[in-house]
């Protein structure tokens, strides 16, 4: 289950974003985005396709330049050049070293990040990659490609992990397994920002939500806080999203 709001309230704010705006010519993709993220929480960026979730992740990661933005990490300015020190971004559809076997790719990243063999073995088991270690990356299904990238992300040392649609390509049982991996990751101290369009998945795994529509924030809070705001005491995230957008 997601962390309780009382636990979140006592965790320090690690990332603060204010006045984030991104334009493509005359089109405003993101308008005056503001959000905070606390240590050890799972924050969900929620919205339909085209809401601005991926663009927001790419701006936060420094992949795309913002037209305006102020980012702070633990109270200190976080310019694009420093973001790779504190965050790791897992975009949708990435397949590293396409012609290499999965085991070799994982061993490479474990070496880069100086992770012991036992640590790598635990991650491989946790994300369910054992059956495909001998396969080449290009031959993996979408679900196993996701598992591979999640394993790479878990090997990295950065305290903040950004993921775009982490459950895409999984069935219900597999989704629950990966949710468990992410929740254990957060419980161990890492902070996660997940872009999710499946609201039921988000409701199950995220501690707080940023509701996006047309590049604007329409609501921020825990499920209980959003229920209070919308006067929907038993409302689902879907009902709340519809009420606010």
Task: Mark where each language-model region is.
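Catalytic Walker B motif of ABC-type/P-loop ATPase nucleotide-binding domains
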Residues: 161-165
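Conserved ABC transporter NBD signature motif
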Residues: 68-83
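Conserved ABC ATPase "signature" region
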Residues: 107, 111, 117-133
